[in-house]
């Protein structure tokens, strides 16, 4: 019989119950016991949903109050020593301080989990890091599930992935792989504690196998699993997010009891494991997207596998369901307004039922679930033929693009002369990245307008009042290129998604980004186009209030793609180019309306990089082409800006230069301008604006600090190509500190301009 198991479930609840309880606890509105009770209830509900899908094993150990990698840092005693906490007796309060910081220590750094939009807390390893086992987190959840009469499989991230996703810290140079011999016995202790608590199978996740691991890391798998296999539970080694076919010989030789492979992201890898002689777990339902599967098609893959493997075939989702929203059935508005689209979707609970149907079809024959299979086929057929998805005009526009459609009319050297002729900017021109503080009044007006409690005219008046204030304050500060402040925008992707065709939105489609922060990504379900102008009215109103140049503000095609649930029936590159052409319509309309400085934000270009470097060039080529398409056809005198914020540029600088924006602004203040050195060494050809202060903190920098950063920038970038700006948008800041911070920036700029003029 085929076995059905789960690897992980969303933690936050169907209606973000965990988020609201956490935040109440942080505000001291509920007790620790009340928070623990909410969490216990959510875990129980999750397990019951898995059991209702006829699962042979429910997942335990996947639930966390913040992040599963933070749980592992606690379980292995690897929490940062700088906090002075005892990992053996860590309170919940201290656990949250590790994640959020306290008055003495900054929070543990966060970064994206592989190529997902989930953030984990990065382990800090020192040459002298000592490990100590504390299996309480995993054992407690196992015992809770057992008390409900459920068969449970604990899930733990493996030792090599744990070390891989960490960072080396401290003054002594070392390779974190050298900590493995100290870490392994601690893992053995944790696994033994689970065996004692009654675990029959333990899942050990090693997604690091899907990236370009150095040879010595790959070699280490032999010793690690030779050691872990001595534990008297069966081990399922789980891989996901990509192919591990290149490691097939190694994986087949490891003394584990089973292997999980992701057949959604990498269906082609099945051939490499067809002769595997132990349990093979097939990840056949997408754990990262929201589309209903065509179950007949899935069965075409797994039925031959079952014939070959018999009882050794297990089935599951491709990875943990953490990355999908909880329950489609609560989306009543979507069901009423877009019934077809509703029928094409599957959230976590629907995916559990898809797996139930597949298990039944494999074990009892397709006839036992004929009705469910017919419904799945009908949804797939309707989606394949829908005129709402497939639009001839969009397809024709893409197909008819001439060669070099993504190129500006002239090279940068000519464009910058045409731009400076009318802009007439001083040395070290100043600007803002885009947004200004989103006050309570702005949020209330937007919410009231959405609920129908505020008329369109009153809403527009409220937004115009905010725009006028933003323009006035920038003029008082003597900024050179102004922004309108984006008061009308709730979110930089959602705002555009609501105005483009081919997008849809949910009410409760939340997924965890980190800790208590959840995001509700738009759904790109069909061909994308722009029915009418999206930003022109706001930007032209702002421009009417000032003689200084006003910057139009758009979110770039790659970022819109990366931060959405994307259709899976055509290549992502095609979707991205469709978005680019829709944005290009907006760019040309802004230009026509007299807005001749236009920013196209691309904070997510780096996030889209594939896990394997061999695939980078193809991605960077279409991502760069999409950006250029969005600004193509502009006059030379129109200045295109872009903004990016991340900590690593060196390896993709040629691709960033190839985007050919006239001005790029980047986040650099927290790295003391280190990032800029890469641009200098690369001889980045166009204008550049390194952030001179950190907007993520309410702290007002001193003039000396800003001057230090600006002088460092002048050493690296020719001063005639240097802009001055904050690190990022000011949406999350208060007005008081915003004005004080900008005043410091302007004072330093005026001082250095005077000095350079001598």
Swiss-Prot record:
Listed Gene3D superfamilies: 3.20.20.210
CC cofactor: Zn(2+)
Family per similarity comment: Belongs to the vitamin-B12 independent methionine synthase family.
UniProt name for this protein: 5-methyltetrahydropteroyltriglutamate--homocysteine methyltransferase
InterPro entries in the record: Cbl-indep_Met_Synth_N, Cobalamin-indep_Met_synthase, Met_Synth_C/arc, UROD/MetE-like_sf
Enzyme Commission number, as recorded: 2.1.1.14
Catalytic activity: 5-methyltetrahydropteroyltri-L-glutamate + L-homocysteine = tetrahydropteroyltri-L-glutamate + L-methionine
Superkingdom, natural source: Bacteria
Lineage: Bacteria, Pseudomonadati, Pseudomonadota, Betaproteobacteria, Neisseriales
Biological processes per GO annotation: methionine biosynthetic process; methylation
Residues at which L-methionine binds: 433-435, 486, 601
Entry keyword Repeat: yes
Biological role: Catalyzes the transfer of a methyl group from 5-methyltetrahydrofolate to homocysteine resulting in methionine formation.
EC category name: transferase
Gene behind the chain: metE
A Pfam family recorded for this sequence: Meth_synt_1
């Amino acid at each position: 019989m085929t076995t059905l198991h789960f690897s992980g479930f969303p933690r936050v609840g169907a209606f973000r119950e965990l988020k609201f309880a956490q935040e109440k606890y942080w505000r001291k509105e509920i007790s620790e016991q009340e928070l623990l009770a909410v969490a216990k209830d959510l875990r129980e509900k999750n397990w019951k949903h898995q059991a209702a899908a006829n699962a042979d094993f429910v997942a335990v150990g996947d639930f966390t109050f913040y992040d599963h990698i933070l749980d592992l840092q606690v379980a292995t005693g690897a929490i940062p020593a700088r906090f002075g906490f005892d990992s053996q007796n860590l309170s919940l309060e201290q656990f949250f301080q590790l994640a959020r910081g306290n008055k003495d220590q900054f929070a543990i750094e966060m970064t994206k989990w592989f190529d997902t939009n989930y953030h984990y807390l990065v382990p800090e390893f020192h040459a002298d890091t000592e490990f100590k086992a504390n299996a309480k987190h995993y054992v407690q959840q196992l015992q809770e599930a057992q008390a409900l009469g459920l068969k449970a499989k604990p899930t733990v991230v493996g030792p090599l992935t744990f070390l891989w996703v960490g960072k080396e810290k401290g003054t002594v140079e070392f390779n974190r792989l050298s900590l493995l011999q100290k870490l392994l016995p601690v893992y053995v202790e944790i696994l033994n504690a689970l065996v004692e608590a009654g675990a029959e199978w333990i899942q050990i996740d090693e997604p690091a196998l899907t990236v370009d691991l150095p040879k010595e890391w790959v070699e280490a798998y032999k010793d690690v699993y030779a050691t872990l296999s001595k534990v008297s539970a069966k081990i399922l080694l789980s891989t996901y997010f990509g192919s591990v076919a290149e490691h097939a010989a190694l994986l087949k030789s490891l003394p584990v009891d089973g292997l999980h492979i992701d057949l959604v992201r990498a269906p082609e890898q099945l051939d490499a494991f067809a002769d595997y002689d132990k349990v093979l777990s097939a990840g056949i339902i997408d754990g990262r997207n929201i589309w209903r599967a065509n179950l007949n098609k899935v069965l075409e893959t797994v039925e031959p596998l079952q014939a070959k493997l018999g009882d050794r075939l297990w089935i599951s989702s491709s990875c943990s369901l953490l990355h999908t929203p909880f329950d489609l059935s609560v989306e009543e508005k979507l069901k009423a307004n877009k019934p077809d689209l509703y029928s094409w979707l599957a959230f976590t609970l629907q995916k559990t039922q898809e797996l139930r149907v597949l298990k039944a079809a494999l074990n009892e024959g397709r006839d036992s679930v004929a009705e469910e299979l017919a419904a799945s086929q009908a949804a797939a057929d309707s989606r394949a033929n829908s005129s709402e998805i497939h639009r001839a005009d969009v397809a024709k526009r893409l197909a008819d693009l001439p060669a070099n459609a993504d190129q500006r009319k002239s090279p940068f050297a000519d464009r910058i002369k045409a731009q400076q002729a009318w802009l007439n900017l001083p040395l070290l021109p100043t600007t803002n990245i885009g947004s200004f503080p989103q006050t309570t009044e702005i949020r209330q007006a937007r919410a009231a307008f959405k609920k129908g409690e505020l008329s369109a005219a009153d809403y527009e008046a409220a937004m115009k009042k905010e725009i006028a204030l933003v323009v006035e304050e920038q003029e008082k500060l003597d900024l050179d290129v102004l922004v309108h402040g984006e008061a009308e925008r709730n979110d930089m992707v959602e705002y555009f998604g609501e105005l483009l065709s081919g997008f849809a939105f949910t009410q409760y489609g939340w997924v965890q980004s980190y800790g208590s922060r959840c995001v509700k990504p738009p759904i790109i379900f069909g061909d994308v186009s722009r029915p009418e102008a999206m930003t022109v009215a706001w930007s032209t109103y702002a421009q009417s209030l000032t003689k200084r140049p006003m910057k139009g503000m758009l979110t770039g095609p790659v970022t819109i793609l990366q931060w959405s649930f994307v259709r899976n029936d055509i290549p992502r590159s095609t979707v991205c180019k469709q978005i680019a052409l829709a944005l290009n319509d907006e760019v040309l309309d802004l230009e026509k309306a007299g807005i001749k400085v236009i920013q196209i934000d691309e904070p997510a270009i780096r996030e889209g990089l594939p896990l394997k470097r061999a695939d980078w060039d193809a991605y960077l080529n279409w991502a760069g082409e999409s950006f250029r398409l969005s600004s193509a056809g502009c006059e030379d005198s129109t200045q295109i800006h872009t903004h990016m914020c991340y900590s690593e540029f060196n390896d993709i600088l040629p691709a960033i230069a190839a985007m050919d924006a006239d001005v790029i602004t980047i986040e650099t203040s927290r790295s003391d301008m280190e990032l800029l050195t890469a641009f200098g060494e690369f001889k980045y050809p166009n204008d550049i604006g390194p952030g001179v202060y950190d907007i993520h903190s309410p702290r007002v920098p001193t003039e000396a600090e800003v001057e230090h950063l600006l002088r460092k920038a002048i050493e690296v970038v020719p001063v005639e190509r240097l802009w001055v700006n904050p690190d990022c948008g000011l949406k999350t800041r208060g007005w008081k500190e915003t004005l004080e911070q900008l005043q410091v920036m302007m004072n330093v700029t005026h001082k250095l301009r005077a000095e350079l003029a001598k």
